[in-house]
Amino acid sequence: MDYIQTLFTSVNQVGEKIDSYKSSLNLINPGTCENLSKEVSKDILLSNYAFTGVRADVTKGFCTSPWFTVSHAFALGSQVLPPYSFSTMFGGEPLFLRGSVDNDGAVQAMLNCTWNSNVLSKVQMQLSNGAVPNMCQIEHDHKGKDFSFSFKAMNPWYEEKLTGIYIISLLQSVTPKLSLGVEALWQKPSSSIGPEEATLSYMTRYNAADWIATAHLNGSQGDVTATFWRKLSPKVEAGVECQLSPVGLNHSAALMTGPKPEGLTSVGVKYEFAQSIYRGQVDSKGRVGVYLERRLAPAITLAFSSELDHPNRNAKVGLGLSLELPGSDEMIQQQQQQLAAQTA
């Protein structure tokens, strides 16, 4: 028993020394692996903003505590968005729920549960009778003082000794500015589809005061993605994303035509003004895109999207309008306060 007690005492002492050393480094939480290059890929580049055709969104809020809204979305001439969809959101502590249904009967639902300020669980489901496959996704995120851990399961099922896609990722701060991460993916489809597959990815992030650099390496296919973000002024940001692949950026096409090294570099800029946000982008394939979002009033937002593909002589244009209708005296008062602050 004395040996066991001595062993546990030694382990505790080692753990205390490690914690003391980590505290002396002044490490911070590095964010999540999913948001490794968020400043470039999600905030500046147009992949999350560009659209085609005409769209309109009408949102009505009923209360703010808990938060409850309903929304109607209309789209014309879009190859991605359905002609009509109805969605609703309900949020409070600790739950947040969102659901939508479109004109084809496709249903999407999401549930977020915040256990505490550092632990978050998510469940997403998609049911459709069309070309889009059904999907169920379970996520769990844990943020520590100097690390972030995430687990994700897509379409998990117990048959054939567990099938689905499972992803585990860890991002750890090693200095106040430098973070290193690893992500493991295990995919096991049913025996009628194909064999199982496992991959490892490695990532790093360097966060300086006014610029951020990231790199991501897919260990199995050799794909490399690097980004650089810089804040040029309080209202202007710029970013660069470079993708390199030894087998081609479109892996499904590479299976049919054979591997072909390919690369793509995108440069983007974001201007943020009091009533509008402008995003512009150009890539190495000769495509130029712009996205402009203008708030005409506290409840009315106008969006314009355009892309010119010079080598292929193709152009895409989109125009959108968002209308937010207050549904309570409290929400009307909030909009009036917002308008007064903007005109002051």
From Swiss-Prot:
Protein name, as recorded: Probable mitochondrial import receptor subunit tom40
Query: What protein family does this chain belong to?
Result: Belongs to the Tom40 family.
One GO BP: protein insertion into mitochondrial inner membrane
- Provide the primary localization: mitochondrion
What role is this protein assigned? Channel-forming protein essential for import of protein precursors into mitochondria.
Q: How does it assemble?
A: Forms part of the preprotein translocase complex of the outer mitochondrial membrane (TOM complex) which consists of at least 8 different proteins (tom5, tom6, tom7, tom20, tom22, tom37, tom40 and tom70). Interacts with mitochondrial targeting sequences.
UniProt cross-references to InterPro entries, sorted A to Z:
Porin_dom_sf, Porin_Euk/Tom40, Tom40, Tom40_fungi
Instruction: Alphabetically list the UniProt keywords.
Output: Ion transport, Membrane, Mitochondrion, Mitochondrion outer membrane, Porin, Protein transport, Transmembrane, Transmembrane beta strand, Transport
May I have one GO cellular component term? Answer: pore complex
List locations, semicolon-separated. Answer: Mitochondrion outer membrane
What terms describe the molecular function in GO for this protein?
ATP hydrolysis activity; porin activity; protein transmembrane transporter activity; protein-transporting ATPase activity
Cited PANTHER family: MITOCHONDRIAL IMPORT RECEPTOR SUBUNIT TOM40
The membrane-topology field of this record reads: Multi-pass membrane protein
Report which gene this protein is encoded by.
tom40
